[in-house]
Curated annotation (Swiss-Prot):
Subcellular location, principal: cytoplasm
Purpose of the protein: Cleaves peptides in various proteins in a process that requires ATP hydrolysis. Has a chymotrypsin-like activity. Plays a major role in the degradation of misfolded proteins.
GN (gene name): clpP2
Subunit structure: Fourteen ClpP subunits assemble into 2 heptameric rings which stack back to back to give a disk-like structure with a central cavity, resembling the structure of eukaryotic proteasomes.
Superkingdom of this protein's organism: Bacteria
Gene3D superfamilies: 2-enoyl-CoA Hydratase, Chain A, domain 1 (3.90.226.10)
Protein name: ATP-dependent Clp protease proteolytic subunit 2
Keywords of the record: Cytoplasm, Hydrolase, Protease, Serine protease
Active site (UniProt): S92 (nucleophile), H117
Any Pfam family: CLP_protease
Organism of provenance: Rhodococcus jostii (strain RHA1)
Length: 195
């Protein structure tokens, strides 16, 4: 009989061991470094076995829109399903990625908090540059609202209204809103992910 940890020793990092189980973890602010790491992990695991799910655990305050969109696009690009698990805090881009998991495979742990708001950015420079950046920012805001609507079943207008200011959700409220498909308190309740 072999165990899931056969061949591993104590010097293996926790994250390496999780990766071998097809579990990846976003436990920081979303930036280019973590986005590149997660994208590489998703691509690697998808190439290794496109028939097995990847489980992405999210405990993140959010962060960079462009870095988050790289993760989002890679999740959609992967041949295998990416199941998402909200734990602790899934705010801003963390919420966006949580709701972007494979339909039917988006989970929140019971005490997770989910927060949605409109994207924000600091803009500076010449008047012409500010006008260009403002136009790009408006496009990004609209695009994100459309994607959240697609993943939650809400209308774009509802997402736009609800994200005007910080809007907080309990795990149960996130389920009712459509960010997640299940609230689970035990791994066995999320059957089939990472197996």
């Amino acid at each position: 009989m072999t165990s899931a940890t056969a061949g591993l020793n104590l010097s293996d990092s926790v994250y390496e061991r999780l990766l071998r189980e097809r579990i990846i973890f976003l436990g920081t602010q979303v930036d280019d470094d973590i986005a590149n790491k997660l994208c590489a992990q998703i691509l690697l695991l998808s190439a290794e076995d496109p028939s097995r799910d990847i489980s992405l655990y999210i405990n993140s305050p959010g962060g960079s829109v462009s870095a988050g969109m790289a993760i989002f696009d890679t999740m959609q690009f992967a041949e295998c399903d990416v199941a998402t698990f909200g734990m602790g805090l899934a705010a801003s881009m963390g919420q966006f990625l949580l709701s972007a998991g494979a339909k039917g495979k988006r989970y929140a742990l019971p005490h997770a908090r989910i927060m949605m708001h409109q994207p924000s950015a600091g803009i500076g420079g010449t008047a012409s540059d500010i006008a260009i950046m403002a136009e790009q920012f408006a496009h990004t805001k609209r695009e994100m609202a459309e994607l959240i609507a697609e993943h939650t079943g809400q209308t774009v207008e509802q997402i736009t209204a609800d994200s005007d200011r910080d809007r907080w959700f309990t795990a149960q409220q996130a389920l009712e809103y459509g960010f997640v498909d299940h609230v689970v308190s035990r791994a066995a309740q999320a059957g089939g992910t990472g197996q």
